[in-house]
Amino acid sequence: MAAKDVKFGDDARQKMLVGVNVLADAVKTTLGPKGRNVVLDKAFGAPTVTKDGVSVAKEIELKDKFENMGAQMVKEVASKASDDAGDGTTTATVLAQAIVNEGLKSVAAGMNPMDLKRGIDKAVAAAVEFVKSSAQPCEDSKSIAQVGTISANSDSHIGDIIAEAMEKVGKEGVITVEEGSGLENELDVVEGMQFDRGYLSPYFITNQDNMSVEHESPFILLVDKKISNIRELLPVLEAVAKAGKPLVIVAEDVEGEALATLVVNNMRGIVKVAACKAPGFGDRRKAMLQDIAILTGGTVISEEVGLDLESATLEHLGQAKRFTMSKENSVIVDGAGSADDIKARVNQIRKQIEETSSEYDAEKLQERVAKLAGGVAVIKVGAATEVEMKEKKARVEDALHATRAAVEEGVVPGGGVSLMRAVAAIADLQGENEDQTAGVAIARRAMEAPLRQIVTNAGEEASVVAEKVRGGEGNFGYNAGSGVYGDMLEMGILDPAKVTRTALQAAGSIAGLMITTEAMVADKPEDKAGPAVPDMGGMGGMGGMM
């Protein structure tokens, strides 16, 4: 085991503080509408330019092990804010830096670190309650666009496209962000349920122009096994032919003579038919077939529930207004399932999302909810260069997280104003002793830091602006983008309450741990001496060779 280096007390805390400040100083330059860019070097390819706090934080590693520990703990603050709310990483970092700096001064002055931490926790909890209670619901397109705009560093195009996407697919819909091919941002919306399986044979194609299968108001047969024997399918085919409607088969697979017979029937016009594989694999495939059954008002033909294909009737088939298939995807529009059944299924899947511990499973379940409840929107990000594309895509993702958070818990005035109002709201808060009250004061002072940093980045005098905002009330604040004072909500400067709350909680938690640190242990740096040069001994007798 390698030897360890141990530092105690003030020595340890000062080293840690250096790391905290290096990381926070790099991150906080990006805060606000006039935040600056940070350029990150990459081992391969062009450097990345970003105004995203967590991207900057993730890049920073310090050579000194003890300083690096401080930096990594603040990085944890940014990551926590990013994971929980998807935004607010820079605000969280600024808050943590302010609490740690003030807190360590108080520890050096002889105050009890544990009492300071209790005071900080008390103030943070009270401020969080204030933020929650002052939040206003965010439901209309305009406020969603404003939240997206602020989070995307005042890019109104991004805010507008996110608001449009949310309007089209609803709050439950899935919105994904992809790299586009043009210069402009584009929005693609798929209504209905889309899944990534295409037609099994090109002979099913009905629209030669775009090489797709399109059937209006078809019957939909759902089977959770392979179909290779045509005899099993005959009763259903005959019933559908009599009804004079098209048939779409969604099964684990259709192969051999069954597929050949379907193709021949289709080409001769005896019955319009098309087939595709069921989406997903294993248990997820069964669940998705069940989703399609509920959406279309049909029944999955499965031997597990005692149903076989030969006994299937028209009652077992689902229906939809339209079913389209391309080579890779299929879309069911306007399934005939009852709204109550679909709602019950959505609630059941939501319960599974709450219970699952796997992020991957939660994401897949959320996709299923979207397919049943809303739709899927894809935002294609356009840019002139690869570097700009990456930077813009990161901002769109940030803005998307922020708007989701706003819809979830409401909005508060932005620009650091809600935290300034929280300071006033907890002005009378006292601890159980002097040191705890000092902890409360530290947290209150720190809550002014985001506003001061936004103003500093805009090139104004922080103390003057902070004093003026403190003197106002309600939503009165300073718009650093235009240099105007006024009502932040009316000026469209909003922050999601969840983002502000998460930033404060993450900062208070990690900063409290740092203030109460008394010892630090790290590996001793190894002395990397060069390889020893072998001595030239044993060659001394060469003189006699002359």
UniProtKB/Swiss-Prot annotation:
Q: What class of enzyme is it?
A: isomerase
One BP annotation, GO: protein refolding
Q: Where in the cell is it found?
A: Cytoplasm
Return the SUPFAM superfamilies for the record. Answer: GroEL apical domain-like, GroEL equatorial domain-like, GroEL-intermediate domain like
Q: What is its EC number?
A: 5.6.1.7
Reaction catalyzed: ATP + H2O + a folded polypeptide = ADP + phosphate + an unfolded polypeptide
GO CC, alphabetical:
cytoplasm
Its keywords, alphabetically, are: ATP-binding, Chaperone, Cytoplasm, Isomerase, Nucleotide-binding
Q: Which GO terms describe its molecular function?
A: ATP binding; ATP-dependent protein folding chaperone; isomerase activity; unfolded protein binding
Q: What is its main location?
A: cytoplasm
Q: Which positions bind ATP?
A: T30, L31, G32, P33, K51, D87, G88, T89, T90, T91, G415, D495
Q: Which InterPro entries match?
A: Chaperonin_Cpn60_CS, Cpn60/GroEL, Cpn60/GroEL/TCP-1, GroEL-like_apical_dom_sf, GROEL-like_equatorial_sf, TCP-1-like_intermed_sf
Q: Is Oxidoreductase there in the keyword field?
A: no
What family is this? Belongs to the chaperonin (HSP60) family.
Q: What does this protein do?
A: Together with its co-chaperonin GroES, plays an essential role in assisting protein folding. The GroEL-GroES system forms a nano-cage that allows encapsulation of the non-native substrate proteins and provides a physical environment optimized to promote and accelerate protein folding.
How does the annotation summarize its subunit structure? Forms a cylinder of 14 subunits composed of two heptameric rings stacked back-to-back. Interacts with the co-chaperonin GroES.
Q: What is this protein called?
A: Chaperonin GroEL
Q: Which organism is it from?
A: Teredinibacter turnerae (strain ATCC 39867 / T7901)
